[in-house]
A protein has these predicted regions:
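Conserved PLP-binding catalytic core of the aspartate aminotransferase-like
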Residues: 135-142, 149-187
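PLP-dependent enzyme catalytic core of the Aspartate aminotransferase-like
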Residues: 176-227
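Structural preference for beta-strand elements that scaffold enzyme active sites
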Residues: 27-29, 48, 167, 190, ...
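Active-site PLP attachment segment
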Residues: 45-92
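Structural signature of PLP-dependent enzymes
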Residues: 99-145
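Active-site phosphate-binding strand-loop segment of PLP-dependent enzymes
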Residues: 1-37
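The feature captures the short pre-catalytic strand/loop hairpin that immediately precedes
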Residues: 87-105
Length: 227
């Protein structure tokens, strides 16, 4: 069973405990990129957890990890790997058995600088704690939802804190989509538009100035709609 911890289109946060109960002993593979670093998820229930470090962890591009349970190591067979995906020393020329670890899925030597960036970012997260980060982010997300409600912009992502992480999805009328995205852009607000919806995502460091920019964008949008 393969799932995204947080759906990038809808912002929905899955219930890993519920999924594990339903699928029984089947392998559970989790793409955690949209929630790792801000969601206190029970990752130990998964057999595979994979995530990049460039999003919530803020470690920059070229960072990430793959974690496998013992059962996943025994069950999964790599289709494509590099020369270092074996436990053999040196640079053998013959085809060898893959390593008995997540190393079996590596394709090249690691980047020490990227490793250092990821380690430093994770140390900062560990120092603060995921629950504290999640609580602060929930406040920021709620403020975006409240602003959208104030200006009658429909929120189609979940409002329940147990079903969301850091993505708010709003859905203007189809003929108002371009107007909304233009208003956001003109006020310096970065957003993502997909399939007729607009995604907004704060961070724990999103400040009052940024929320004022978002309010300004919504104000311009609402004024143009009412003309």
């Amino acid at each position: 069973m393969q799932v995204s911890l947080v759906d990038y289109r809808t912002g929905y946060l899955v219930d890993l405990e519920g999924i594990r109960q339903v699928i029984g002993d089947r392998l559970l593979i989790v793409d955690a990129i949209q929630g790792f670093g801000v969601v206190d998820a029970p990752f130990a229930l998964a057999d595979v957890v994979v995530s990049g470090g460039q999003k919530w962890v803020r470690a920059g591009w070229g960072t990430g990890f793959l974690a496998l349970s013992d059962r996943a190591v025994e069950t999964l067979v790599p289709v494509f790997s590099g020369f270092n995906a074996t436990d053999a020393d040196g640079t053998p020329t013959e085809v060898l058995a893959p390593a008995r670890s997540a190393r079996a899925f590596s394709v090249s030597n690691p980047d020490p600088v990227a490793q250092a960036r990821l380690a430093a970012a994770l140390e900062e997260i560990a120092g603060v704690g995921i629950p504290a980060i999640n609580a602060r982010l929930a406040e920021k997300v709620s403020r975006i939802i409240d602003l959208a409600d104030e200006f009658a912009v429909e929120v189609v992502s979940s409002r329940a804190e147990s079903e969301r992480a850091g993505i708010v999805v709003i859905a203007p009328e189809p003929d108002q989509l371009t107007l909304l995205t233009a208003s956001l852009h003109n006020h310096g607000v970065t957003s993502t538009t997909r399939e007729g919806t607009v995604r907004l995502s704060p961070h724990v460091t999103t400040d009052e100035e940024t929320f004022a920019m978002l309010r300004g964008a919504f104000t311009s949008f609402a004024s143009a709609v009412n003309l």
